């Protein structure tokens, strides 16, 4: 059974924990409480399998605190990560500026492929859903960008996340197959 480690990173108060709880069907949190360091959520998704035989997959979603005071812990969090989801609040301009730092640190410096990264522009309840006006500078404009609004269309983000998990598992399966073939040859 394949086990994938996915990091949820991004600025403070961007909605990482709310999204992580929703996507893993964990408990809801009603009051804001900043994540201290990291929370690890383990889950399985029946829609994601590692091959045509329907072998299940396990996931660890690492909900990482966005405060810079945890920066010294980031190398340990990044170890053996298979994917990175950068969550930001699309309504806060400073979050857009910070995204390049998150991308550089968690994706580029870890030699992850862009396909292993997804951006989520999270819209908090009552903020409106302005999907059209978000322009990102290179290299962020090459990444998969998904808007999430748990109030108006929660299933859209769930379906996009499942697609993302499937791509991570496919990549892991292909890598494992290549490794097995190299051992046999």
Curated annotation (Swiss-Prot):
Disulfide bonds: none annotated. The keyword Nucleotide-binding applies. InterPro entries: P-loop_NTPase. It holds the Pfam family Roc. It is found in: Cell projection, Cilium. Signal peptide: none annotated. The keyword GTP-binding applies. The modification Phosphoserine is found at residue 137. Keywords: Cell projection, Cilium, GTP-binding, Nucleotide-binding, Phosphoprotein. GTP binds at residues 10-17, 63-67, 123-126. Belongs to the small GTPase superfamily. Rab family. Component of the IFT complex B, at least composed of IFT20, IFT22, IFT25, IFT27, IFT46, IFT52, TRAF3IP1/IFT54, IFT57, IFT74, IFT80, IFT81, and IFT88. Interacts with IFT88. Interacts with CFAP61. Small GTPase-like component of the intraflagellar transport (IFT) complex B. This is Intraflagellar transport protein 22 homolog. It comes from Macaca fascicularis.
